[in-house]
Amino acid sequence: MPSSLFADMERNGSGGGGGETLDDQRALQIALDQLSLLGLDNDESAMYDNEPRKKSINMTECVQVPSSEHVAEIVGRQGCKIKALRAKTNTYIKTPVRGEEPVFVVTGRKEDVALARREIISAAEHFSMIRASRNKNAAALNGGSVPAPPNLPGQTTIQVRVPYRVVGLVVGPKGATIKRIQQQTHTYIVTPSRDKEPVFEVTGMPENVDRAREEIEAHIAVRTGGLIEVADENDFHANGTDVGFDLHGSLWSKSNQSSGSRKALSNYRNDSSSSLGSASTDSYFGGTRMADYSPPSPDLSYTNNNNNNNGNGYVYSTGISPDCTDLTFESGFDPAPAPPPSAYTWSQLERSTGSAPYHNNANGILLNQRRLNGVGCTTAPRLSPPLHTCNGLSEHPLARRVRSDPGGGLSYSAYSNMACDSSSSSSSSSSSSSSSSSSSSSSSSSGMRRKGSRECSICFESEVIAALVPCGHNLFCMECANRICEKNQPQCPVCHAGVTQAIRIFS
């Protein structure tokens, strides 16, 4: 239509006013073209009558919530909840910033804005109910009364108390652990605040609540290595020490004990004074006597089985054994049951019958011991003082190597056998009373010492009363031993080993 009109106007244009008429016609043509492109012709006028009504559907509404805490709950962590609500309702929701009024501004179509408004108000009411339940339970705890039952039928609320130091462990990083427990058990768990008691409130169905409590306790056990007892009498568990030995008690218990009577190491251990030699075994044997504070010896805890378990926690090879295994000892625990024969205690060493007197210093270290090899006695390398001797004389620990040292080339087996036989005969012929037996043993020992005294291997005049360190050869008098040590390069005349000092042997 516009092109034909333009052709007609060109054909009809004439005269002086034709130029103006042509310009007017061209302007009219351009206007008609623009109107046709915009669709404002009469045929389509009815379709655009509703255009103002379509634009009026987009609207903006303000939705107010009670507090800024409600805003934080509705927005969610890093805006995750509000983003989901925007996508669900196809609206734009402007969240209030901190310090402003808690009002959400929702923009969109009318029905979408109404849906977003209902969602926001529902979330705010739900959070208000949760806050009211928390305040009610807190008031019940402070008032000492029983918490009110939950609103929903069939649900129950329990309290799970944990130690203060594991509250953060149960909550987890950014609440991940407690959320996982809630999702797995289908419960709602209220975590304790910093200024309240360490009690988790678990709400849900009874079986789900029990599962949640078990999950919390299991998580604490896994992360700390063992179950934590919060009883007042168990202060070791309360302050965070000795946790986790219950699971591995079989590794530390005595080998001869049955599994039914076995106890954890946390109940059978030395305190901070164990380095000073306190080793109480009352908790292990179930006795009520006072603790025996004599020093524990690794050699006294020798076990004759192959797993090398002992009560003191020391582990030694099977080659370390007492000298004479055919002797019996009386128990060191009067009111309690007798311990296994493989676990000797230090007190039994002091109470063994017929043994020579021992000289102890303040630290309980055996100083002067004389051990003689006899019938039925087997010698083995030792890491600690011997358990007992052959009812005879004791020898210094550094000087007794001459008895079993083949490098020295000097053997006194005849003298040793004579000493053991004489000592055994004197003890067997003594009376049944302990006093007469000990006096007979001491007299025979003193007589044997005078009879078997030796002369110095250098001067052949004085009695042998000195030994060289570290080789331990006791073949010299004190004067000759000192002269050996005073040389420029002191060495033992027997084994030619370096000598650091000479010690006097007291019998």
From Swiss-Prot:
Cystine connections: none
Q: Where found? A: Cytoplasm; Nucleus; Cytoplasmic granule; Cytoplasm, P-body
Q: Where is the composition biased (Low complexity)?
A: 426-446
- Give me the Gene Ontology terms describing cellular component: nucleus; P-body
* GO MF entries: RNA binding; zinc ion binding
Q: Which domain of life is it from?
A: Eukaryota
Quote the Gene3D superfamilies the UniProt record gives.
K Homology domain, type 1, Zinc/RING finger domain, C3HC4 (zinc finger)
Ranges annotated as RING-type zinc finger: 456-496
The UniProt function text for this chain reads:
RNA-binding protein. May be involved in post-transcriptional regulatory mechanisms.
- What is written about domains in the entry's comments? Binds RNA through its KH domains.
PANTHER family, sorted: RING FINGER AND KH DOMAIN CONTAINING PROTEIN 1, RNA-BINDING PROTEIN MEX3B
Protein name per its UniProtKB record: RNA-binding protein MEX3B
What is the organism of origin for this protein?
A: Xenopus laevis (African clawed frog)
